[in-house]
Amino acid sequence: MNTVTELLRADSRVSGYKFNIHKKESFELFFVKGRLETVRSTDTCDREVTVYVDHDGFRGDAQFFIYPSTTAEQLRALIDEAVGKALLIDNQAYELPEKQTGSYTVESNFADYAPGELAGLIAEAVFSANDIPNASLNSVEIFLNRHTETVVNSRGLDKTQVRYDAMVEAIPTYNGEKQSVELYQQYNFSTMDPEAIRAEIADKLAAVKARYEAVTPEQPLDCPVVLNRQELAELFGSIAQDLNYASVYAHANLFRKGQPIQKAPTGDPIGITMTGQIPGSVRSARFDSDGLSLGSIRLVEDGQAVNYYGSNRYGQYLGETPTGSLPCLAADPGTAGTPQGTYLEVISMSGLQVDLYNDYIGGEIRLAYYHQGGQVLPVTGISISGCLSQVLNTIRLSSDTAVYRGYQGPAQAILSQMKIF
């Protein structure tokens, strides 16, 4: 990177620059019908350069990638092209972070294992979950990743972080008398916990059997709806995104600081904190792509918006202290225990739709469990919809918590006044 640094510093048109360097080392296992077919390791490095150009009271920027084979002559051409593109962008002026340096590691017990050993332990946990007759894991792929990320800019910032993650992709299959049913599963984690891995795969194997057995209800259902962690991550994530600096700057936010999100609450109060790190989350980071150190900030307290959050650029635009692009969301647990009585537990959706402006929440259900009188009936071919403001006012949140990607919070939520059709 020395040559490109020298060329950028020597170019009077360039007002600033930033390097984002991402080195990724992976170890991968590929299984077909329980048999290990392929073992692969990779080592890649992406080097992205951002060029900033101040012009006419504005700041423009443009990016390009460089490779080990990129020559000095090619670098000059890339810089010239980037300057030309940046001159076409009229962003409000802002400053880059400055004079922060350091090397960091995101906490993970992956560092305690050799890659091959860890991959083998994960595979053992995955296949030990297969204890349902006529069910199998048709295909399993395991990816272990070690990321080394560096941010350097023209104002003296120079930071490096190391973080780890793993992904298991599996095709659980159930072979019934009438047909064979397959589901797709992607499980991401950054802490080695064999029991958690086994439970995750076992739940999906149970789900594929249930999907085979699922029926479409003959009569409309009328009962509370229970959402699990994936849908709750989408619900709370929609609220958090509305309070992001970028949304506020664009006047695209519905909620305002100091105003209630739950206007007439009768359920559990909603609390949301945005943070840089959550134990076990694959999105945890010590700093963002601008190099800003990531802490935490309370967004929602007792159902009321109390802060905004966001990137260096948009924080400066709003006159707020930049928090950085915080990747993790922690939602407060509630007081609800295990749901009782008659209710519909959502297992899989085509995607939860949350429309803040149209006061809507709903979506198509691929698989759900209908609980009634101690019996559980797998159902499919139905949808749910409701008034978002009513749902937020009456929501009951579980005291048990779960982690899903960048989310940590209630494992379940009970929604009333939902239409099932």
Residue ranges of model-derived segments:
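Active-site bordering "gate/hinge" segments
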Residues: 1-277, 282-285, 412-421
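Dual-mode signal for accessory low-complexity, basic/Gly-rich regions
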Residues: 260-421
